[in-house]
Design a protein with these regions (language model features):
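A phosphate-binding glycine/aspartate-rich beta-alpha loop in the early core of alpha/beta enzymes
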Residues: 87, 221-288, 375
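Glycine-rich phosphate/diphosphate-binding loops that line cofactor/substrate pockets in enzymes
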Residues: 204-212, 326-333
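General beta-strand structural signal in soluble alpha/beta enzymes
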Residues: 214-217, 224, 250-252, 273, ...
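N- or domain-start disorder-to-order transition segments that initiate the globular core
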Residues: 196-206
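Internal gly/pro-rich beta-alpha loop/helix module
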Residues: 320-323, 331-409
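Conserved small/polar residues in nucleotide/adenosyl-binding loops
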Residues: 419-426
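Intrinsically disordered, low-complexity, mixed-charge
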Residues: 1-187, 191-195
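Divalent-metal (Mg2+/Mn2+/Ca2+)-assisted nucleotide/phosphate chemistry catalytic cores
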Residues: 271-272, 279, 283-347
């Protein structure tokens, strides 16, 4: 007869817990991650966006393993700051669900930052036959606009500017499929149901080829663009914008193209390719290259960035005469575009189409709008890489509104910052 005693392993007992997760857990694919972990460990209950982050009620025999997987295998954009648990009574249920968002003040929730187009979406963008082939607003759980389209918290589709675009049946299926990369991805859309451009990419590319200045509505505001190799166009932009000496940022397709124009010290390539996609100030190469000397007059540096939206990639694609396949994305083409903030000197970045149409009329020859509202303006971030270290010069798109954690202790200090750049009319 088998002896009985305390040394025998006890069979796991079901339990139920409420878990409140704070940090960067809204808009980064965290709820789908919770859903998949629940299915993996046989956990029932629900997960939803709440006023203080993400709220989970989990029931099962493997809650600890479930929670360990949540933290150790979190999505790439997620950041867990705290995880608070409380025991609950068991409930008669048999499934796990993504629940409706809990309304209320969002004191503990963090708005995610905008993120550059991911490799998976970039591949789909240039795959003929894919339903999002050449779609200017392709995105998924791992990439796309977040902060700049958020109207209020908690972060859900109906609290963002994507609320204006009802999902088509096919996108709805992807949005509801736990195995899809677009499961509860709020920016999800397609050619049939998503935002639209005011004119074709081909028209804009033609204007750039002709030496014209183009205003382009992006995710956080308008850019002014021209061919960075066209000295007359660059000087014309400088004159129209009344920007005598300040350098212009330049966008190139990839780091192979960047290496043609700048030196790439340790850390520079990684920063250029980072999900934040800032303007990276780097030592300019001297000698015979084709960029206009009016880009950064009197300076030995050049600010470069890589494309971070589908519209940017589509522009390069059109300017290169629509190459097929994917290899062209990594090749050095030498193509370079000025991408500078579209604002009058001293004024904040323009985000409204009507405002852009009026105030940029004397600067831009062509204006490319889209009909997704920019809920929060965000200029391009600017960083400098030196001796392998990154120094942030302007902390904006890609970093905003992530908090900066400070060491404890020291005096209490009140810091105030204007939401937009001051203007003479303020």
């Amino acid at each position: 007869m088998q002896p009985r005693g305390d040394n025998l392993a006890r069979a796991p007992q079901p339990e139920r817990r409420r878990i409140r997760v704070r940090g960067l857990v809204q808009g980064v694919g965290f709820r789908p991650h919770v859903f998949r972990c629940a299915a993996r460990f046989g956990v029932t209950g629900f997960v939803g966006n709440g006023p203080e982050g993400v709220v989970i009620e989990a029931q099962g025999e493997a809650i600890d393993a479930f929670l360990a997987a949540l933290q150790e295998q979190a999505p790439p954009l997620a950041r867990i700051d705290s995880l608070i648990q409380a025991s609950l009574a068991l409930v008669d249920e048999s499934s796990f669900a993504i629940a409706a968002t809990v309304a209320g003040a969002a004191a503990g929730a963090a708005i995610p930052a905008d993120t550059a187009l991911c490799d998976a979406c970039l591949a789909e963008l240039f795959t003929p036959g894919d339903r999002r082939y050449l779609h200017p607003f392709i995105a998924c759980c791992d990439c796309g606009p977040r902060f700049t389209m958020t109207r209020r918290l908690p972060y859900d589709r109906d609290t963002t500017s994507m609320a204006d675009f009802a999902l088509c049946p096919t996108c709805e299926d992807e949005y509801s499929d736990p195995l899809s990369r677009r499961f509860h991805a709020e920016p999800v859309a397609c050619h049939d149901c998503g935002p639209r451009l005011s004119q074709s990419i081909a028209t804009v590319a033609g204007a750039l080829r002709a030496g014209q200045i183009v205003a382009i509505k992006g995710i956080g505001g308008y850019h002014l663009a021209c061919d960075a190799r066209d000295d007359a166009a660059v000087n014309r932009l400088r004159s129209r914008k009344h920007r005598d000496g300040k350098p212009f940022a330049v966008m190139v397709l990839n780091t192979a193209s960047a290496g043609r124009y700048v030196q790439l010290p340790d850390g520079a390539t990684a920063m250029l390719q980072s999900r934040e996609r800032p303007v990276v100030v780097l030592p300019a190469r001297t000698g015979n290259h084709t960029l206009s000397p009016a880009l950064s007059p009197g300076l030995s540096t050049l600010g470069l960035m890589l494309p971070y939206t589908a519209v940017h990639y589509l522009l390069f694609h059109a300017l290169l005469d629509a190459p097929t396949g994917q290899q062209w994305l990594q090749q050095d083409h030498g193509l370079a575009l000025v991408m500078t903030s579209a604002n009058l000197s001293g004024d904040p970045l323009i985000i409204d189409p009507a405002d852009a149409q009026t105030r940029l009329a004397g600067i831009a020859d062509v204006i490319l709008h889209h009909d997704r509202e920019i809920a929060a303006r965000a200029d391009d971030s600017v960083v400098r890489v030196s001796a392998g270290a990154t120094h942030i010069i302007r902390r904006a798109r890609g970093y905003t509104p992530h908090a900066i954690k400070l060491a404890g202790g020291g005096p209490r200090v009140l810091a105030c910052l204007l939401y937009t750049s001051p203007s003479p009319r303020d």
